[in-house]
């Protein structure tokens, strides 16, 4: 989607805020992990088909078989081994996941410094005001899991518990040992960062200490950006990470990176070959979208269990399947396909639901990503839309990336759940080394 679609999405958010607030909060409903009620699992030709072939429902979420006929072929590696750093394509690892030695701090390895500062929605232009969703007390995503979908469209989640609000988040900046202030440096920016983010103890920074000392990656600055708050549709986190637009990349470029340079005395490279994005789950999808929307800014992407599914909210008529449409058709009923130009929705000449990657010229993106055999499967029980199987989505990404000649390494992990911590500890050092291979900036 082009930049104009960002403004359309903003208009849709504004319209959603005009809806009346719910008068009573629903009871708490837990996340789903099986086929949702009312799903179409029988007729592949009918709208919103959910393919359950090859899924073992004795576990929750179901366990996927990497030999599934619907998945691209992959190389199965001996248990405990990882793909070669120079290898590209699809690989299967596990079932055991021992932490890599680079995850442990070493006394003889110089340590980088960590600088932390805080930003608020009042400081922002792009994300001011923020979004806050009213969930039942102590009920994560409660109002999302009890919402309804639009009549005839299982992909369009409709609820009225979100409203304008504020956000506060921390930014962690890792500066490698020996960095000369003011010198140009490559960097990696990752979502779900900060002190309460997805990297407790800032494990990534220890890994970078070791990899930089071993000269396996260039000395780089790492920027961990805290999420905006809550999760999924109707939240600030979901608004930022799940939108298939350039808005988040623009926010990072215009509002975060200048503060990083100001606070730590760094000079971040403007060369996209020396800029990387990283994330987990929805921030993993955002990491890819940053590079897809702005390849002139980012060309290296790393993601664990990226949410390449239909999580974008509000529903965008220009891309009804959200990130699912990177790799696959929108599975809803046949209808007009739309695009956005100069804030006007117009008919598209492309077939309805045309996926983005297969129908766009290849972009200079290098992508490492992973998914678990027990990754998420239709966590929202009301969205039986055929677009919420994380493993199928990421396998679909591997398929279309290969067909378009992208440079990528995709890891399917046995005995691994969503953003599986043992798998992250096993693979992140080698993933970072693969990601930065061939970087022209040292």
Which residues make up each language-model segment?
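Non-catalytic cap/lid and distal C-terminal segments of serine-dependent acyl enzymes
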Residues: 29-35, 40-56, 61-63, 71, ...
